[in-house]
Swiss-Prot record:
GO biological process annotation, one example: L-histidine biosynthetic process
Protein name from the UniProt record: Imidazoleglycerol-phosphate dehydratase
Protein family membership: Belongs to the imidazoleglycerol-phosphate dehydratase family.
Top-level taxon in the UniProt lineage: Bacteria
Keywords, ordered alphabetically: Amino-acid biosynthesis, Cytoplasm, Histidine biosynthesis, Lyase
GO terms, molecular function: imidazoleglycerol-phosphate dehydratase activity
Pfam family, one: IGPD
Catalysed reaction equations from the record: D-erythro-1-(imidazol-4-yl)glycerol 3-phosphate = 3-(imidazol-4-yl)-2-oxopropyl phosphate + H2O
Gene3D superfamilies hit by this protein: Imidazole glycerol phosphate dehydratase, domain 1
GO CC term, one of those recorded: cytoplasm
Pathway where it operates: Amino-acid biosynthesis; L-histidine biosynthesis; L-histidine from 5-phospho-alpha-D-ribose 1-diphosphate: step 6/9
UniProt keyword Lyase, yes or no: yes
Subcellular localization(s) per the UniProt record: Cytoplasm
């Protein structure tokens, strides 16, 4: 089985985070951010992406969860970029639609080296557990910009905010899994420019 492992450590005045990922894993996870709902979502991303993730974050949660969530996105983005290496043979694009009961979400990504994000969410509550729902977009932005990917995430419809966000994180994992999949027919990288 192919492995693509990356370790990243980041310490600031607000957070301290260490991460180890294997892009071609089995979906094993050991994630501790101090934010229960966020841990649950990251576990889902790892499991459905078949990405092994070990991550421990200590943040200034006495302030709020913003710094921790955003900085976890930064560290995971850096980890993905490092684990991808030269990107030879990867399919580059991934799209997933995931239903969660009454909710439906989609995530499309392009491992292009050109970070960009578009989110279309209409959450109807401010918080789930200790996590502000607006931080879903902050996490995705930090992830995309530090991984060097274009990411479009959308909740097409839904009523239960937990279900909507859960569908987004599952779709993120599945889209990543598709994009990093190796196709032996690809000579070099999937670009006419010869670089990603």
């Amino acid at each position: 089985m192919k492995e693509s492992i990356a370790k990243v450590y980041r310490k600031t005045g607000e957070t301290e985070i260490k991460s180890e990922i294997n892009l071609y894993g089995e979906g094993k996870y050991d994630i501790k951010t101090g934010i229960g709902f966020f841990d649950h979502m990251l576990n889902l991303m790892a499991r459905h992406g078949l990405i092994d993730v070990k991550l421990e974050a200590k943040g200034d949660l006495q302030v709020d969860s913003h710094h921790t969530v955003e900085d976890v996105g930064i560290v995971l983005g850096e980890s993905f970029k490092k684990a991808l290496g030269d990107k030879k043979g990867i399919k580059r694009y991934g799209t997933s639609f995931v239903p969660m009961d009454e909710a439906l979400a989609s995530v499309s990504i392009d491992i292009s080296g050109r970070p960009y994000i578009v989110c279309d969410f209409n959450f109807t509550v401010d918080k789930l557990g200790e996590m502000d729902t607006e931080l879903v977009e902050e996490f995705l932005r930090a992830l995309a910009f530090n991984a060097g990917i274009t990411l479009h995430a959308r909740v097409l419809y839904g009523k239960n905010n937990h279900h909507m966000i859960e569908a987004v994180f599952k779709a993120l994992g599945r889209a990543l899994r598709e994009a990093v999949d190796i196709d032996e027919r690809i000579n070099g990288v999937m670009s006419t420019k010869g670089t990603l």
